[in-house]
Amino acid sequence: MILLSYLLTYLLCALTCSARAIHNGRSLIPRAGSLEQVTDFGDNPSNVKMYIYVPTNLASNPGIIVAIHYCTGTAQAYYQGSPYAQLAETHGFIVIYPESPYEGTCWDVSSQATLTHNGGGNSNSIANMVTWTTKQYNADSSKVFVTGTSSGAMMTNVMAATYPDLFAAGIAYAGVPAGCFLSTADQPDAWNSTCAQGQSITTPEHWASIAEAMYPDYSGSRPKMQIYHGNVDTTLYPQNYEETCKQWAGVFGYNYDAPESTESNTPEANWSRTTWGPNLQGILAGGVGHNIQIHGDEDMKWFGFTN
């Protein structure tokens, strides 16, 4: 009887432990069709939260879009307020929604840590989310993209500068150049009024050197960039559109003063699209302030999901 009791106890424990292992194993794989948090995606030096949307119509070797929220925003708010999850169901890509760890939920685009490749800041944490997702879902590393609005657009430019090897393209909605919000006190999540008010003005070559210094040993290809901004933005002044386009024109070696083309009323009335080359476009929205509309269908074209 004693032996039988031990055997029954052992079997019960084995079944319970196995069930727990299966449950825990499943918990590591986010459910498709809903926004899910991933708590263990590797090194997370700045405590950024990771949320992910895996579509029910997941492509084999899917693409990835990193969608970065604005100040006061959250992953949930950007998931609900942007078109990327819905577009993921159509095109089969995965969406990563990082969430800022700071009060007010702006992003750290000001410290040396975040402005340095593998420097231990927010950019480092977000890059590790991309690496985890690529491995977990056997994603196509040539189809990884980044976009964001306001503070998220600032981080989009920072990600393109600090991790150019990870991204094929970026789209920044109402941001500033990478490095423009640098804090002289090396404070994360700092506000830079000089930059915000469009007073940080320099040459394309100087802006390019700032971006390139964030990953100084890198000599590979860089993500093509599309820059949106409203021409009556009073939060991040419209001069930041000019300076951001200068920065990427400098990076790509384009003559900022001689764009290839400028199209009026594109992608909508009173908006204009300027193209400097295959790797850089700027869209200036006439009569639009800081709350600029995301153009999901246009984003899909820039990212190569549609023609």
UniProtKB/Swiss-Prot annotation:
Q: Which cysteines are joined by disulfide bonds?
A: none
Q: Which residues form the active site?
A: S150 (charge relay system)
- Reaction equation(s) it catalyzes: Deacetylation of xylans and xylo-oligosaccharides
Residues annotated as signal peptide: 1-19
Q: Does the keyword Nucleotide-binding apply?
A: no
Instruction: Describe which pathway this protein belongs to, using the record's wording.
Output: Glycan degradation; xylan degradation
Name the top EC class.
Answer: hydrolase
This protein's major location comes to secreted
Known SUPFAM superfamilies for this protein? Answer: alpha/beta-Hydrolases (SSF53474)
Q: Keywords on this record? A: Carbohydrate metabolism, Cellulose degradation, Glycoprotein, Hydrolase, Polysaccharide degradation, Secreted, Serine esterase, Signal
List, alphabetically, the GO terms of the cellular component aspect: extracellular region
Record's subunit section: Monomer.
What function does the entry list?
Acetylxylan esterase involved in the hydrolysis of xylan, a major structural heterogeneous polysaccharide found in plant biomass representing the second most abundant polysaccharide in the biosphere, after cellulose. Degrades acetylated xylans by cleaving acetyl side groups from the hetero-xylan backbone.
UniProt name for this protein = Probable acetylxylan esterase A
Species of origin: Aspergillus flavus (strain ATCC 200026 / FGSC A1120 / IAM 13836 / NRRL 3357 / JCM 12722 / SRRC 167)
What lineage does the source organism belong to?
Eukaryota, Fungi, Dikarya, Ascomycota, Pezizomycotina
Q: What gene is it encoded by?
A: axeA
